[in-house]
């Protein structure tokens, strides 16, 4: 997030000082994409770039209007949320038109809505945040001079929370790191909980195939949780076979026993 980016910038300055000769550029992948698009517009573009829509209400209205047009019904907030989630998933997973019908959004006409949504954005010269990454990736793939420029600009790349990174984000990172191979990714597929938002932990599992010279280092010491918590967590996560085998070891002394609490609804959780 932008807030996390600013916090990391502040931490770097606190550690190394404002006068450090080489202050790293700390950005979200959307921030990097924006920089790529701006550079393309200045050096190759024949007109102004599309505008990123920051007002979520504008995008929600487009989805709502299209839903009403296609179904003849008014969309509830939950319907709009699911449809927008589906749109973002398609773009982040780089799905093709042939895959749209397989996506479970609860709306049979989602493929047509998706096409019309993107058409509506282009007609307004708008792009959403996911388009920003699509355009950046397309630019890097089709303009070798721009790709070389940003590969030279980012000779060393560090990616945090890599398990939450989407497929298209990994593709952009791979393009930028291709020249030097100086890529350091920090992530844990066991902690990937944003699959519904198109997080792509498979990229971590395929890391050595994507980057043949890579080394994978496991950090198995846990400084946060007690042995009781880690015992349960290790036993639970081993049931997932699509992961790197690892056992997290505690550094803290024993704590209280772990209790399983059942709550019938959200209100019942408040007591805990």
Locate predicted features.
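Helicase P-loop NTPase motor core
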Residues: 212-215, 220-272
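Phosphate/oxyanion-binding loops and surfaces in catalytic or ligand/nucleic-acid-binding neighborhoods
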Residues: 15, 39, 43, 69-70, ...
